[in-house]
């Protein structure tokens, strides 16, 4: 029986060339990159080389690149960094259909005194961009909306959302 995998929003296999490049780190170069010994230092150098390559591709500085271990950590780092950089702003916008990790972070932020706006979706899973526009305020620190819903597969109009958010001078995370 042949299988068709339709849940690539949740997890995706790595490209063969990525797998090949990672084999040494699964078999020989598995030291702790933070260790002071040579074994760890070799891994640390590989991570720094990767950071520099990513920075070059993005037109950024290597010290601006942060590697995380998973999507949950990535989302939390992005949102928390935005809030720490703008302590005077206490409002966050996201959707009711975000990944559970972001919903949990939102609940945590509400307990810490932040105000969250959770945008709804229609019966087809689409966002109302007028609702987003109305929700943005002077104290909005960040808008965090996933590119595509991991349960329904609905793709959100990220380019349009990014333009709307940028016009208002608000940080955007997707």
Language-model-derived ranges and their functions:
Residues 1-174:
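Pyridoxal 5′-phosphate
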């Amino acid at each position: 029986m042949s299988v068709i995998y339709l849940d690539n929003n949740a997890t995706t296999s790595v490209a063969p060339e990525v797998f090949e490049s990672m084999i040494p780190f699964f078999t020989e170069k598995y030291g702790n990159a933070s260790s002071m010994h040579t074994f760890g230092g070799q891994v640390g150098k590989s991570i720094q080389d990767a950071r520099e390559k990513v920075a070059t591709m993005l037109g950024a500085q290597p010290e601006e690149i942060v590697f995380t271990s998973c999507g949950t950590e990535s989302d939390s780092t992005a949102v928390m960094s935005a809030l720490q950089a703008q302590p005077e702003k206490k409002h966050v916008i996201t959707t009711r259909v975000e990944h559970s990790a972001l919903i949990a972070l939102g609940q945590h932020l509400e307990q810490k005194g932040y105000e969250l706006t959770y945008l709804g979706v229609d019966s087809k899973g689409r966002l109302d961009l007028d609702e987003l526009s109305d929700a943005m305020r002077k104290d909005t620190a960040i808008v965090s909306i996933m590119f595509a819903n991991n349960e329904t597969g609905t793709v959100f109009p990220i380019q349009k959302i990014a333009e709307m958010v940028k016009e208002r001078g608000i940080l955007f995370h997707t």
